[in-house]
Design a protein with these regions (language model features):
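Intrinsically disordered, low-complexity basic tails/linkers immediately adjacent to helix-turn-helix/homeobox/MYB/SANT
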Residues: 229-239
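Active-site/catalytic core of tyrosine-dependent DNA strand-transfer enzymes
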Residues: 114-175, 180-182, 186
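C-terminal catalytic core of tyrosine-transesterase DNA break-rejoin enzymes
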Residues: 69, 73, 180-206
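Short, polar N-cap/turn motifs at the start of nucleic acid-interacting alpha helices
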Residues: 87-94, 195-214
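Non-catalytic DNA-binding core/recognition domains of DNA-processing enzymes
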Residues: 1-16, 27
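Conserved tyrosine-mediated DNA breakage-rejoining catalytic core shared by Y-recombinases
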Residues: 83-127
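Basic, Lys/Arg- and aromatic-enriched nucleic-acid-binding interface segment
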Residues: 1-3, 21, 25-78, 82, ...
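Catalytic-site neighborhood detector that most strongly recognizes the C-terminal catalytic loop/helix
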Residues: 42, 99-103, 204-228
Length: 239
């Protein structure tokens, strides 16, 4: 009975545009018996720029820069990098990666159109012309065996001094820096720039329930400023 009700509520939110507050509580049976899930660190835009500027300006370094830029701007999973293609006469970038939906028999995610969220340098947005560079087949680095792209990216970056510094910055906040931290940046920035959770979930290639379970923490990052604004006087009260 409970599973049926949960399924109905998820359907209403994911397919019928009901508000996210109707989602049932997320329960992961595996989490009860396994170790605590690590908290993924979202890279900031300034950290991404710092990292990219530190990578070597040579053939190999430029391939990895391109990969990092794509992951940050489009919110890619590392494995998405293998499955990129264009549609609509080259005007749209898509990922054809089909990821298993954990716990759901045989279900996988569908191909999705990718939407850029540009990295900012202060008040200016940086356009790295990623779609154009992909169209002319700018090379990406070797990503190893299928399903191991995250490990390949991590192996390369862990050798770099700036990445080690960023790891320490993440650990100081009780979080973990991984190859997915570029994707976490995308989610955090989408929330910060005012996109709706369902829009962000669709662009990242998962359903709203999964998104809320993984990224709801980014929805409350601006609590301090929100309460500061709420406590500002709206005007003088007449005596």
């Amino acid at each position: 009975m409970r599973q049926s009700l949960h399924g109905l509520l998820r359907y209403c939110v994911n397919r019928k545009s009901y508000k996210a507050c109707w989602l049932p509580p997320y329960v992961d049976d595996k989490a009860v018996v396994t170790k605590k899930k690590r908290i993924g660190y979202p890279l900031t835009d300034s950290q991404i720029i710092r990292l990219l500027e530190s990578l070597p300006d040579d053939e190999i370094g430029n391939k990895w820069k391109f990969a990092c830029q794509l992951m940050a701007v489009y919110g890619l999973r590392p494995e998405d990098l293998r499955h990129l293609h264009t549609r609509n006469k080259g005007k749209e970038l898509w990922s054809g990666y089909e990821k298993s939906k954990g716990g759901r028999k045989g279900e996988t995610t569908e191909a999705r159109r990718l939407f850029p969220l540009l990295v900012s340098d202060g008040d200016e947005l940086i356009d790295w012309n990623l779609l154009g560079r992909f169209q002319i087949k700018e090379p990406l680095p070797s990503l190893g065996k299928e399903g191991k792209a995250g490990e390949s990216i991590g192996t390369y970056l862990r050798r770099k001094l700036v990445w080690k510094q960023l790891q320490q910055e993440a650990e100081s906040e009780g979080q973990q820096l991984t190859a997915y931290s570029f994707r976490h940046r995308y989610s955090a920035e989408c929330h910060a720039r005012g996109l709706q959770p369902k829009q962000i979930a669709d662009s990242m290639g998962h359903d709203l329930e999964t998104h809320m379970n993984s990224y709801a923490r980014f929805m409350s990052k601006d609590l301090e400023s929100a309460f500061d604004a709420a406590n500002k006087p709206k005007g003088k009260i007449a005596a």
